[in-house]
Swiss-Prot record:
Its cofactor is FAD. Its EC number is 1.14.13.232. This is 6-methylpretetramide 4-monooxygenase. InterPro entries: FAD-bd, FAD/NAD-bd_sf, PheA/TfdB_FAD_monoxygenase.
């Protein structure tokens, strides 16, 4: 047990302790609950009522959530469909990724507020009597016996609690506490030349995710439910501090110049640094995804750029891939690193592929300089008309198309879906 001279009191034993109530953690929790496992979720935030940026669901993620019985309920809470994405340079369309050409019913990019998705997942988890949810609870230690992870330590002193589990799943994001406590090395890889400054504006809806190149730094823009547009203004990697030192008026003017279509709205609605948030963009990967009794999934195991809207989809796919491995491990009472490595063996190649595609997209769409400006229009026209581009578009949209929700592992007589 790490970090606690006076061990807290033991809590109940559970089959799986999931740390992190994001898309990866809650999807896995529901999958395991539907398969008859006891699941304890530990989430440091007290509620889902907080700001989220990533909310674009690709068709592959939509299909998996639908198979789990979650998509319809989350959509009913409010969402916005986009027909595809477009790269626009000074009013001219260079690339048009038309998702309507993909087979239905998931032939769109779905802007679904993460709060809506997580709320629906959490409600369905709470319908299961084997589910325990510890919100507002921080993990600050692992229970270890002979090098095997046996649970987590939450809090400390008189208010502390030990959650013992057959397997601990770290799904607590890019700065994962579980990963650090487990001593798993993480390689941060500086593959991208841009960071992203996000802001949300009230503006009319559009049907396309767009990348604007209008003379300033490129801007990502998409409609967000109910009546907002999310703007992601790109700026040189690690360059925000120097920019911010020139004052908010300067930052706002740079954003206005980069996206003339929203210039007046930016002027009216962005008033201070509180209205923007910086995303440090980098790639990263844990060197191991597992230890005896412990598994990492989602951003805890691999980190991606926001370009291409892959993060949520990869997280959901990780959960779907981990589900049958954990079910079999619990049945065999084998949750060793060797056994759990089956998850990384399946998912790591896919996540590395996603990173390579994101690097390609970043260089094509976001790079600056005279050479890039001269080459981009011709290169975009040539690339977008090749069969290889259509293949890449399908890979972006679906990811690993062999992944399926293993509903054959679900128990009969489950709680009714809502």
């Amino acid at each position: 047990m790490t970090g606690h001279p006076r061990p807290p009191a033991d809590g109940a034993h559970t089959d799986v302790c999931v740390v992190g109530g994001g898309p990866a953690g809650l999807t896995l929790a529901l999958l395991m609950l539907r398969s008859g496992a006891r699941v304890t979720l530990v989430e440091r935030s007290r509620s889902l009522d907080r700001a989220y940026r990533g909310e674009i669901l690709q068709p592959g993620g939509q299909a998996l959530l639908d198979a789990l019985g979650v998509l319809e309920g989350a959509r009913r809470r409010g969402c916005h469909e986009h027909d595809g994405f477009r790269l626009e340079e000074r009013g001219r369309t260079l690339i048009n990724g038309d998702y309507r050409r993909l087979p239905g019913p998931y032939n769109c990019l779905l802007s679904l507020p993460q709060q809506h998705l997580l709320t629906d997942l959490l409600e369905r988890c709470r319908a299961h009597p084997r589910f325990t949810c510890l919100t507002g609870t921080k993990v600050n230690g692992l229970v270890e016996e002979g090098g095997v992870v046996r649970g987590v330590v939450c809090g400390g002193g008189a208010d502390g609690l030990v959650v013992r589990a057959d397997c601990v799943v770290g799904a607590d994001g890019r700065y994962s506490t579980v990963r650090k406590l487990a001593g798993i090395p993480y390689d941060r890889i500086e593959l991208f030349d841009q960071d992203v400054l996000w802001c949300k504006l009230t503006a009319p809806a559009t049907r396309t995710v767009r990348i604007f190149r209008a003379g300033g730094n490129p801007v990502l823009a998409y409609t967000s439910f109910p009546d907002c547009v999310q703007l992601g203004w790109t700026l040189p990697h690690k360059g925000y501090q120097a920019l911010a030192e020139r004052g908010f008026a300067h930052v706002k003017e740079r954003i206005r110049a980069a996206v003339p279509e929203y210039a007046d709205t930016v002027d009216q609605q962005l008033n201070s640094f509180k209205d923007v948030s910086l995303l440090d963009v980098f790639a990263g990967s844990a060197r191991r995804w597992a230890r005896d009794g412990l598994l990492l999934i989602g951003d805890s195991a691999h980190t991606h750029s926001p370009i291409g809207a892959q993060g949520i989809n990869l997280a959901i796919q990780d959960a779907v891939a981990a589900h049958p491995v954990l079910c079999e491990g619990l049945r065999r009472r084998d949750l060793s690193e060797r056994f759990l490595d089956a998850v990384a063996a399946r998912r790591r190649p896919e996540t590395e592929r996603a990173t390579r595609v994101q690097v390609m997209q970043s260089r094509m769409m976001l790079s600056t300089g005279r050479v890039s400006a001269a080459v981009r229009p011709k290169a975009a026209m040539l690339v977008s008309r090749t069969p290889a581009y259509r293949s890449v578009l399908r890979r972006i949209a679906y990811g690993d198309q062999t992944l399926r929700v293993r509903s054959d592992l679900f128990e009969e007589g489950e709680p009714a879906t809502v």
